[in-house]
Amino acid sequence: MTEQILERTKAQQYNFNKLQKRIRRNTGQAIADFNMIEDGDRIMVCLSGGKDSFTMLDILMSLQKSAPISFSLVAVNLDQKQPGFPAHVLPEYLESLGVEYKIVEEDTYSIVQDKIPEGKTTCSLCSRLRRGILYRTAKELGATKIALGHHRDDILETLFLNMFYGGKMKGMPPKLVSDNGEHVVIRPLAYCREKDIIKYSDMAGYPIIPCNLCGSQPNLQRQNIKQMLNDWDKRFPGRIETMFRAMQNVVPSHLADFELFDFKSINKDSGVINGGDIGFDKEEMPVATVEDEDMVQEFDPSLKLDVTNI
């Protein structure tokens, strides 16, 4: 029995290391591709208490130790005074990490409850209030960048939300200037899959704090989109990867936005543009690959792993 427990522990450690390596690689690639973090940056890491922001802080702290540049981190949590919110959890956790942090206390919960009729979604107002407070806090802390924990699935969901309900080809940018024009906002987990973050968070044992506002509201449009994408992912492995790659491979000449591409000046002397009238590039598209998700079976007593060299 003791040997079985030992082997199970090794398997768990192997799986954890494997996931961490993949998330680190994807995060590092996103940071490099979009120049998210520069030498001397002070990054305000927005920590909600959910799996995404915990993972983001974890990975950024890990990258900080090996990065070729120097940057500092300060974790910030907004205590919105939701009933039952365990105010002690995050300070205790952050103290144990030894990371600089700040807890901002603002009763946005009462404002949202007062302004939004019962049965209506609170996300929009809650988000606006939260952004304003975080922008102010970033200025007070002297932060050069604000890091949010949105991942690849969030970005795709936003794209489909805007297509289905807003009539726009618009997603969630990995890097942008804040609404008030004073801050640069980054999303280091932009290349990371939610399924990886869920597994990693479970293995890490983060003290997750559920949101009693957003998560408790049924039939949200985003939840419907998420369910649709999850269904596609199960039925057609690789489709999610292909769709996200499409967001990085936009061909304006083959869309219909005349402000994005100058269609009016096209004539027979313009030549063939981006393949001309070929509507589907299947022959030229690389085969979508799904990253290896295989996990070592935790209860296999025959497993022999040396995790010290992983």
Curated annotation (Swiss-Prot):
GO molecular function: 4 iron, 4 sulfur cluster binding; ATP binding; magnesium ion binding; sulfurtransferase activity; tRNA binding
Enzyme nomenclature, EC number: 2.8.1.-
Requisite cofactors: Mg(2+); [4Fe-4S] cluster
Record GO cellular component, one term: cytoplasm
GO biological process, one term: tRNA thio-modification
Miscellaneous: The thiolation reaction likely consists of two steps: a first activation step by ATP to form an adenylated intermediate of the target base of tRNA, and a second nucleophilic substitution step of the sulfur (S) atom supplied by the hydrosulfide attached to the Fe-S cluster.
Subunit annotation: Homodimer.
Name of the molecule in the record: tRNA-cytidine(32) 2-sulfurtransferase
Organism: Vibrio vulnificus (strain YJ016)
